[in-house]
A protein has these predicted regions:
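Post-transcriptional modification and biogenesis factors for structured RNAs
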Residues: 1-166
Length: 166
């Protein structure tokens, strides 16, 4: 049982929509393992994703990570994890800056594809669409940098940093 399970069912989640880069998936697994956050991977990925490659991407964080795979966007929406909490999409086309949003326990933070973001149907399904302000002469942050910033703020707001030093 992971730390995410130990602290109750209404916990933050991170979801990656059809990731393009396997190294980013590995970084997301590590991020989620360290923060006690469940990770949803919405397939298809732009790279072959097997149980073996997932274990390789997780490195030694696999046993500490709660990773759920979903065959499609529709399967993700029907999953038990999606029946609670809001869907919070991080996008360069966001309506509100991260710092103006009030996170709640149970929110799922959704990250789009590195190459293309998410389609309109995903935008429409989101309860909130956020952006992280960056300098105007730059295009975007790495998807896992966005996930780390977003989860950090969400956990800060909801009191989710309840870890004791090792």
């Amino acid at each position: 049982m992971t730390r995410a399970h130990l602290r109750g069912s209404l916990r933050m989640r991170l979801a990656l929509f059809q990731p393009d880069i396997p190294q980013n998936l590995g970084a997301a697994i590590r991020l989620c393992a360290c923060l006690g956050i469940s990770l949803d991977v919405i397939e298809p990925c732009a790279f072959p994703l097997s149980d073996k490659s997932l274990k390789r991407a997780a490195l030694d964080y696999g046993p500490q990570a709660d990773v759920q795979r979903h065959d499609s966007w529709a399967a993700f929406l029907k999953s038990p994890a999606r029946q609670e909490g809001r869907l919070v999409l991080f996008t360069t086309k966001g309506a509100s800056p991260l710092h103006d949003f009030r996170f709640q326990p149970g929110d799922t933070l959704l990250m789009g594809r590195e190459s293309a973001g998410v389609p309109d149907e995903v935008h429409e399904a989101a309860d909130a669409r956020l952006f992280i302000p960056i300098r105007p002469e730059t295009r975007s942050l790495n998807v896992i940098a966005v996930a780390a910033i977003g989860l950090g703020e969400a956990l800060r707001q909801t009191g989710g940093y309840d870890f004791q030093p090792a």
